[in-house]
Amino acid sequence: MMKENKELMAEARASLSGNWGLAVGTFLVYIIIVGTLQVIPVIGGVIGLFIAGPMSVGICMFTLSLSRDENARLEQIFEGFKNYGTVLGAYLLMVVFIFLWALLLIIPGIIAAIAYSQTFYILAEDDTIGSMDALKKSKEMMDGYKWKYFCLGLRFIGWALLCILTLGIGFLWLSPYIQISYAKFYEDIKAA
């Protein structure tokens, strides 16, 4: 039986209890690395293309560890580089597929992004799976759960608006909360 989104969010808050400092610090390092590259014209975007996927897998490893009450460590955000070829391949394929679907209209692009949303969690757990297989598995896992995932994301819009009022500082706390909630979602659909 699938849990309600509010239950997943409550579980995420429980996982973050006592771990907020680690979570905020880890996301701050992630944001500094990825964000700094995005502000460097041209070359930053190119370099960012090659590190965003592995860093995202690392964030998934970190959030899954926190979600499971395991030993989460800041260094986990760099563990996506251990399986670099597969992770980069999956990231580039996701970018291309989502872009192609978005060319049709915005809605198909959003649906494609949601369908592939579990790819990095799959790669975080299984470093033997190939890029295309991870994308296919994500698409299969999300079959019947896309709306639930979309609604989970919508629950954070109010919080995001409040974070804007803090000149973005609130996102240091909101980002881990959102990502742990998505990790809980992954665990829930994996068990379903």
Regions found by a protein language model. Give the residues of each.
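Hydrophobic alpha-helical membrane segments
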Residues: 1-192
